[in-house]
Amino acid sequence: MKYNFDEVFPRKGSASVKHDLMKPFFGTEDLMPMWVADMDFKAPECVLDAIRKRCDQGFLGYTFGDDSYFGAVIDWFAKHYSIKAEKRELHYIPGIVVGIAFCIQAFTKPGDKILINTPVYPPFVNLPINNGRELITNKLILKNGRFEIDFEDLEQKSKGCKMMLLSNPHNPGGTVWSRNDLVRIAEICKRNGVLVISDEIHADLTLPNYKHTSFSTVSESAKSNCITFIAPSKTFNIAGLSSSIAYIPEKSIRDTYFEYLEASEFANGNIFAYIGAEAAFSGGEEWLSQLKDYLVENIAFADDYFKRNLPKIKAVLPEASYLLWLDFNGFGLSHDELQHRLINKAKVALNNGVTFGGNDYAGFFRMNIGCPRSILKEALDRIANAFADVR
């Protein structure tokens, strides 16, 4: 089957965070939404059909993850991550951010140090602080348009930390960390008593010619000292189903985490979380393959557009996902002026780079290009027009 990713669908008025909740963040709703990591493509038909079938049954009562659900998860893990997971090592989680919050509460106490690499997905910055932990930052190095880890700094910063939050693949840069990168992280963290929480939500959006490596697979040091989170939400554009999975191969870590969940009376998810995930993992592979081809074309289109029309914007092109990390500092304008132009002249909503790790990322913005190409072109045209006088 050939999927049409060029088709444009009206999403305004559907209580979409991306489309209908811009005013609290940008002061206006009159913007093109190129911010929240939510694609403007319909979910795979296999997912929609499975949900319709259950709705037609007429019963929407309490539901648990059955063997069919876990079988689909285990098969996907084996095929795509080379993980031989067992059901007892897995637990449903409503969302990875919530799952990480549970980790912070279960394994650390107020005042403990938690390590992150910046720039990084804003909840990695916010969760430790909001839970009364001390945030320690290891600043990534941007080299030849790609992020690299400063391992000397990581070694020093990890001492005294209780936990490291790892974005694998990296958000916002889209970097697919190499096996060697992950081995070194595992060795450093194991040596210094730092539990690694690996957020692998963008793993299945690793683009052709790149290979995702799941953290737990790189060494015994990694496998025995981590919690890995995976989700079909970004992959199949079903974030609203609140369906994620925690994978914990080490029994002592698993027992502590599961005991925390039990003490919190956290058990089962909503009915469509299981149905949607199982359908996606069982029948969504062809859709995903074509989606990734389309995303590659979108990335190439945006890259060419910047080079021809907006050469002062430097883009970090992703190896995974549909997010571009954009450096606007070439315009010589303050961060506030850049933001003002984007909102008031371009009327385009981009994620503010400062939220990814502080003022080191002033002048940077994250752009979501998981949309029909006509939408992408219009957004780029708007940005070009808004900055025409400072080119």
At which residue positions do the language-model features occur?
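Helix C-cap/helix->beta junction micro-motif
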Residues: 131, 191-192, 222, 346
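PLP-dependent enzyme catalytic core of the Aspartate aminotransferase-like
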Residues: 222, 341-350, 356-391
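Conserved glycine-rich beta-strand-loop-beta hairpin in the small C-terminal domain of fold type I
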Residues: 278, 294-303, 315-328
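Conserved core of the PLP fold type I
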Residues: 60-187, 204-205, 212-217, 221, ...
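N-terminal small-domain helix-loop-helix segment of the aminotransferase-like
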Residues: 2-95, 102, 280-281, 390-391
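Conserved core segment of the aminotransferase class I/II
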Residues: 49-50, 220, 224-296, 304, ...
